[in-house]
Amino acid sequence: MTELNEFVIDRKVPSVMRDGTTLYSDVYRPKAEGRYPVIVERVAYELDHRLEPYAEWYASRGYVFVGQNSRGPFWSEGEWVPFADDGWGERQDGYDTIEWAAAQPWSNGNVGTMDGSWSGHTQNLLAPTRPPHLKAMFERMAPARWGDNEGIDNIMLRPMLLKQLIIQAQHPSASAELRSQIEELES
């Protein structure tokens, strides 16, 4: 029997979406050959250090953990427009990612999603698309309405989120729009 704590990490694993755009993931999986349940988290953040602690925890306990960059930021291809490709439009990156993960040789076909904030919102957009292999979703928190102008969201989190988005935006028009929103918030 393989020790539970033995796992491997495959970096920058490509998956091709329905429109031909390639998104990249870091895949943490048990070292022992086999087919395992998969947990997917889709983010617009750098994958390395943010996901490692709990990705390793899940992989060492018999799960495959897929941390994927959304379309556009970091290694993933395509134009980055926040949340535009996560739901039920022409490009359904969330749906395609779930079905891609289910078809991999290390997957037993049971795929779940997890986490909050950006990842929580991508789950909210994924849910109505109903991928056949999506068995569970764990959203620990995500804003229902990103544009609210009340409370802590407006005071602290919203400007912080916008600054993070500017740093990660690769499309000039998206970056300019975010800058104008930050200027409005700070005035």
Q: What do these predicted ranges mean?
A:
Residues 1-11, 37, 49, 69, ...:
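Beta-propeller folds
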